[in-house]
Amino acid sequence: DFMRWEIQALRDGGTAKPVTTNFMYDYQGLDYSKFADDLDVISWDNYPTWHKEAEIETAWDCGLQHDQMRSYKGQPFLLMESSPSATNWQPVSKLRKPGMLKLASLQAVAHGSDSVLYFQIRQSRGASEKFHGAVIDHYGGEDSRVFQEVCDLGRTLKQLKEAAGSNTPKQAAILCDTESRWAM
């Protein structure tokens, strides 16, 4: 209900702009399928733990999460948050290996994302998020590997711009029932 009240306040204020909210990776506290009708577009925060032993399982799980986000409205979604390098809250905050930024980002696009957005653009100067990755790190130069990889990804996405808004026909389905999961 809270989200609906926020949307109504925006609509009452005269805006017709699309509304969304950040869904989180495999979060079980809410049934996201019940939010979809009230949102104009689905968006989510993707922070997988890459570079661990079961890396292929991480890739599968990310693909499943992307597909689930697309399924809520049957249309492209937005990758609202991702880290171009490390995260500050995982047990071990590993810097992504060279090329992983592009691989993970293009995986999202291949599964129906119309965006690759980052938290954060400039690395925070204080609190715990000063350790969270960013496009522009504390050094601030354009010659860092992460900055250069983001630029390279931007060039690649520009070449793929015709894919934006496209929707692949579904050929299979996996039923996910949050309320049944809660009951278990």
What do these predicted regions represent?
Residues 30-31:
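Short, glycine/polar-rich helix-capping loops at beta-to-alpha or helix-loop-helix junctions
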Residues 4, 12-16, 25, 36-40, ...:
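Carbohydrate-binding surfaces of carbohydrate-active enzymes
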Residues 21-22:
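Short His-Asn-centered micro-motif
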Residues 1:
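Active-site-proximal, well-structured secondary-structure segments within enzyme catalytic domains
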